């Protein structure tokens, strides 16, 4: 039995007058497993928390373990998982929270659907070539998928439909985490 993925400590609710961000927003990180979605989202979470923003991180692995347990990896199950994440993100954003979603969310039409339903949503494409994510994969899942041992593996035996027009495109094989966070902060301040 595997341990449940850990969640970062929550920034407690701030009284309405003390909130830095009055309107909530959703930053949706999408990309292949190992591209750096969770790494960037966690680093941004820490920075926004330090600035006093009400912020939450919804990590795809943690959501799958806690909210979407029992779902498989069919197209329908993946879409259901993405819609559940979007529902929770929307509830939080409605109450002035900046929500960082880190989820593969492989299908473009489902991403468009959920992003259109969310307030102040930004789509961030976290991009790294298959060779790079395979090298980063400490569990060896990509090698197993490439050998045919893992069916329905996004980017290998199941499609990943890259965003055509993301709000921000971060190529993590070319930039540092710090550079990525600075680009994200710049984009977030542009949208305020």
Curated annotation (Swiss-Prot):
> What organism, scientifically named, is this protein from?
Deinococcus radiodurans (strain ATCC 13939 / DSM 20539 / JCM 16871 / CCUG 27074 / LMG 4051 / NBRC 15346 / NCIMB 9279 / VKM B-1422 / R1)
Where is ATP bound in this sequence?
31-38
Q: What is this protein called?
A: Adenylyl-sulfate kinase
Q: Which GO terms describe its biological process?
A: hydrogen sulfide biosynthetic process; sulfate assimilation, phosphoadenylyl sulfate reduction by phosphoadenylyl-sulfate reductase (thioredoxin)
NCBIfam families for the chain: apsK (TIGR00455), PRK00889.1 (NF002059), PRK03846.1 (NF003013)
Enzyme Commission number, as recorded? 2.7.1.25
Q: For this UniProt record, give its keywords in alphabetical order, as a comma-separated list.
A: ATP-binding, Kinase, Nucleotide-binding, Phosphoprotein, Transferase
Q: Does the keyword Nucleotide-binding apply?
A: yes
Catalytic residues (UniProt)? 105 (phosphoserine intermediate)
The kind of enzyme this is, by top-level EC class, is transferase
List the catalytic activities from the record. adenosine 5'-phosphosulfate + ATP = 3'-phosphoadenylyl sulfate + ADP + H(+)
């Amino acid at each position: 039995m595997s341990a449940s993925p850990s969640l970062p400590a929550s920034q407690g609710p701030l009284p309405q007058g003390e909130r830095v961000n009055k309107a909530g927003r959703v930053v949706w990180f999408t990309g292949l497993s190992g591209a750096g979605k969770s790494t960037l989202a966690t680093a941004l979470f820490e920075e926004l928390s330090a600035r006093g923003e009400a912020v939450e991180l919804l990590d795809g692995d943690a959501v799958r373990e806690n909210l979407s347990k029992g779902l498989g990896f069919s197209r329908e199950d993946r879409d259901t998982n993405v819609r559940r994440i979007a529902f929770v993100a929307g509830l939080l954003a409605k109450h002035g929270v900046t929500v960082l979603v880190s989820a593969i969310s492989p299908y473009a039409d489902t991403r468009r659907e959920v992003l259109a339903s969310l307030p102040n949503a930004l789509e961030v494409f976290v991009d790294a070539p298959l060779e790079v994510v395979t090298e980063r994969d400490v569990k060896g899942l990509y090698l197993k998928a490439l050998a045919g041992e893992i069916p329905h593996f996004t980017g290998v035996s199941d499609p990943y439909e890259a965003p055509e027009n993301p709000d921000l495109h971060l190529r993590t094989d070319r930039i540092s985490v710090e550079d990525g966070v600075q680009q994200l902060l710049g984009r977030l301040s542009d949208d305020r």
